[in-house]
Swiss-Prot record:
Catalytic activity: [PQQ precursor protein] + S-adenosyl-L-methionine = E-Y cross-linked-[PQQ precursor protein] + 5'-deoxyadenosine + L-methionine + H(+)
InterPro entries per record: 4Fe4S-binding_SPASM_dom, Aldolase_TIM, Elp3/MiaA/NifB-like_rSAM, MoaA_NifB_PqqE_Fe-S-bd_CS, PQQ_synth_PqqE_bac, PqqE-like, Radical_SAM_PqqE_MftC-like, rSAM
Record organism: Erwinia tasmaniensis (strain DSM 17950 / CFBP 7177 / CIP 109463 / NCPPB 4357 / Et1/99)
EC code: 1.21.98.4
Protein name stated in the entry: PqqA peptide cyclase
Residues bound to [4Fe-4S] cluster: 22, 26, 29
Pathway(s) it belongs to: Cofactor biosynthesis; pyrroloquinoline quinone biosynthesis
Role this protein plays: Catalyzes the cross-linking of a glutamate residue and a tyrosine residue in the PqqA protein as part of the biosynthesis of pyrroloquinoline quinone (PQQ).
Subunit note: Interacts with PqqD. The interaction is necessary for activity of PqqE.
Annotated NCBIfam families: PQQ_syn_pqqE
One BP annotation, GO: pyrroloquinoline quinone biosynthetic process
Lineage: Bacteria, Pseudomonadati, Pseudomonadota, Gammaproteobacteria, Enterobacterales
Length: 382
């Protein structure tokens, strides 16, 4: 496919997964299960070349992610380079390893936005989920420091069955920290979250209660002005139609892994597709011409019931990674869809959520030992 003859638009959003290294062990991490086998990382110069190519194609926003991007000592240089190229720059961090000195350096380099994640609203549960006794107080301190520096206060909480019932306390913490934007993102089941799904998926009753809490606080905050934006993301496991994943395959979003693999979404490396490397191909060639990025573009690839569905232009057939994880074939309709012949797997997961008694300490945490343990069990190693 020649780009000039294609109706494919260039990417707008670049996710730079700088590293898989991380001081925390969250059991819902979206990093690949075999991250312990993926130790190579692009150099500073290689990342900057990726930024230049993405910007030349028209990408406008970049997210620095991981792992924990703060472990990269060259982060200020990467931020500066991206900003000088004209990117809107966003740091996605746990806050562990962040210091006032680093905040100053990032601001001087031109960083536009910092998002800090929390595991819970109290120190005990936060420590249990993160695998760190000191994480909660560090997060509080750095959240306040980010706010004091003049950055928008942007917080992220991943919700699941073990913390969703404290949602009122989570929102109260956000108000206390004077948050401007809060993302209450119910667990999306990829990577380590999929491995731990039975112990993480909330029940429908929990979600109903949570939605009521969010609604109540939205009304309260609309009157008081305490919080500019409260985003509540529910799990698609309780929907009857799939999400339009990533705005369509290879349509808006481009992710580059620590070692340079280019992906149309950050979970796609688990698929039985050999995705190209930025060390071997230009981003232009990867985006427009590679097999991996064209594999699920458009609608021609779709089997039934997606091919004849009048909703296909809305959901694009759903998530290819979810179809692969739950059916073994990424071509299948996303099982979330009630039209899918595999929808029973979703119904079974909902029922399982009502019966499980898995506790936090029984979850499989994202650490090197567990990564090496599950690596041999993977269906496909990207």
């Amino acid at each position: 496919m020649n780009p000039s003859e294609s109706n494919v638009k260039p990417p707008l959003w670049l996710l730079a997964e700088l590293t898989y290294r991380c001081p925390l062990q969250c059991p819902y991490c979206s990093n690949p299960l075999d991250f312990a086998q993926q130790e190579k990382e692009l150099s500073t110069a290689q990342w900057i070349e990726v930024f230049k190519q993405a910007r030349a194609m028209g990408a406008v926003q970049i997210g620095f992610s991981g792992g924990e991007p703060l472990v990269r000592k060259d982060l200020p240089e990467l931020i500066r380079s991206a900003r000088e190229l004209g990117f809107y720059t966003n740091l996605i961090t746990s806050g562990i390893g962040l210091t006032q000195k680093k905040i100053d350096a990032f601001a001087e380099a031109g960083l536009d936005h910092i998002q800090i994640s929390f595991q819970a609203s109290d120190e005990t549960l936060n420590a249990a989920l993160a695998g760190s006794q000191k994480a909660f107080q560090q997060k509080l301190e750095m959240a306040r420091a980010v706010k004091a520096h003049g950055y928008p206060m942007v917080l992220n909480f991943v919700l699941h069955r073990h913390n969703i019932d404290q949602l009122d306390r989570i929102i109260e913490l956000c108000i206390e920290l004077e948050a401007d934007d809060v993302e209450l993102a119910t667990c999306q089941f990829y990577g380590w979250a999929q491995l731990n799904r039975e112990g993480l998926l909330p029940t429908r009753d929990q979600l109903v209660r949570a939605e009521a809490v969010v609604h109540r606080y939205r009304e309260k905050m609309a009157a008081s002005g305490n919080l500019a934006n409260l985003l509540f993301v529910t799990p698609d496991y309780y929907e009857e139609r799939p999400k339009g994943c990533m705005g369509g395959w290879g349509a808006i979003f481009l992710s580059v892994t620590p070692e340079g693999m280019a992906l149309p979404c950050h979970s796609a490396r688990q698929l039985p597709i050999r995705f190209p490397s930025v060390l071997e191909h230009s981003l232009q060639d990867i985006w427009f011409n590679s097999f991996g990025f064209n594999r699920y573009r458009g609608f021609d690839w779709m089997p039934e019931p997606c091919r004849s569905c009048d909703e296909k232009e809305k959901d694009f057939g759903g998530c290819r990674c979810q179809a692969f994880m739950l059916t073994g074939n990424a071509d299948n309709a996303d099982p979330v869809c009630s039209k899918s012949e595999h929808h029973g797997t979703i119904l079974a997961a909902r029922e399982q959520a009502n019966c499980t008694n898995i506790q936090v300490n029984q979850l499989r945490f994202r650490n090197r030992a567990n990564s090496e343990r599950v690596n041999s069990q993977l269906i496909f190693k990207g």
